[in-house]
Amino acid sequence: MKHQVSDLHALKDFALDKRVRKMLFKTDQLWSEIACYEPGQSTVMHSHPREEEAIYVLESIATMSIADENVTVPAGSIVNFPANVPHDVRNLGSERCVIMFLKVNPKILKADRDGKGA
């Protein structure tokens, strides 16, 4: 793949029952998705054992718990954190919230750990 241009606004999609995730791209080394939240929707607390993560807020305000710290991230801001850090994403506002996240593909991390390289 040479390159890919994604119109994040055109890819937005919402559902009343749960947040909607859409894959932007997934390569051998990197992946990215957008997640769209109606007011009151959230992603449960979780962690990624090997992957660092960066979350960019495209629209509205995302409230996150990151390693037991509440963080408010407004549109146009990005937050990143190391692997194995518990985190969640919540839309506590009255408007729709859209985030984009970016992570290293866990398969490449496993290959590096196993000595197979990229």
List where the protein language model places each region.
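A short, N-terminal "cap"/entry segment at the start of jelly-roll beta-barrel domains
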Residues: 1-31, 44, 110-118
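Ligand-binding loop in jelly-roll beta-barrel domains
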Residues: 83-108
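Histidine-centered metal-chelating micro-motifs
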Residues: 42-44, 63, 79, 83-88
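Glycine- and acidic-residue-biased ligand/ion/polar-headgroup-sensing regions
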Residues: 50-52, 56-62
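Structural motif
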Residues: 61-63, 70, 86, 96
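Short strand-connecting beta-turns/loops that link adjacent beta-strands
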Residues: 28-30, 50, 94-95
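Conserved short histidine dyad/triad with adjacent acidic residue
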Residues: 33-48
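Short acidic-glycine-tyrosine-enriched beta hairpin
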Residues: 69-83
